[in-house]
Design a protein with these regions (language model features):
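Short acidic, hydrophobic short linear motifs in intrinsically disordered regions
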Residues: 43-56
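A short, conserved structural fragment
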Residues: 70-83
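Terminal interaction helix/tail motif
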Residues: 116-146
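A short, basic/aromatic helix-end/turn motif that makes direct DNA contacts
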Residues: 54-59, 81
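Short, cationic-aromatic polyanion-contact patches
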Residues: 27-31, 80-106
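Short, amphipathic alpha-helical interaction segments positioned at domain boundaries
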Residues: 95-128
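Short alpha-helical segments that sit at the start of domains
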Residues: 4-36
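Short amphipathic alpha-helical interaction segments
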Residues: 57-72
């Protein structure tokens, strides 16, 4: 299925991408570069550590990114190496990361709203940035074109 550029513009897919990305990163305690790398790896489906390193070239260098994503449960082992016939371990994005990515897609498409409960990290209004994000989220929710 091929999507035209005019279709993406028509549905305003990326109108609130930055806001949704910031919300996801703060809510799920993940860095923006890590989230975007997970989006890339999710499109790859299954990948090796070498594929991960190749995908990481366009992001800022972070030596501990692999370990951090593995320990936090964003990347799972799909097939373990056995040193004879399987020369390397194959990984995949975890259920946790797939659910986050699907939620981001649903919010971008307007099928779901960003949660606005008191438990939301932005609604604690600790910093000026949180207040600005709250205002932007309210504008996004009330946008009739969304």
């Amino acid at each position: 299925m091929k999507i035209e550029a005019s279709t993406i513009k028509e549905i305003q897919l990326f109108k609130y991408y930055r806001l949704i990305r910031k919300w996801a990163c703060k809510t799920y305690d993940i860095k923006e570069a890590d989230l975007e790398l997970l989006l890339y790896l999710d499109c790859e489906d299954k990948f090796t550590r070498d594929d991960f390193i190749k995908g990481m070239h366009i992001y800022s260098w972070d030596k501990s990114r692999w370990d951090r994503l593995r320990k936090a449960g964003w990347i799972d082992v799909w097939r373990q190496r056995n040193r004879t016939s399987r020369k390397y371990t194959i990984y995949k994005t975890s259920f946790k990361s797939k659910q986050l990515i699907l939620r981001i897609y649903r919010i971008l498409l307007g099928e779901e709203d960003v949660p606005s409960s008191e438990r939301n990290v932005f609604y604690k209004n600790k910093t000026y940035t949180d207040k600005v994000m709250n205002t932007a989220m309210e504008r996004m929710k009330n946008d009739p074109t969304r």
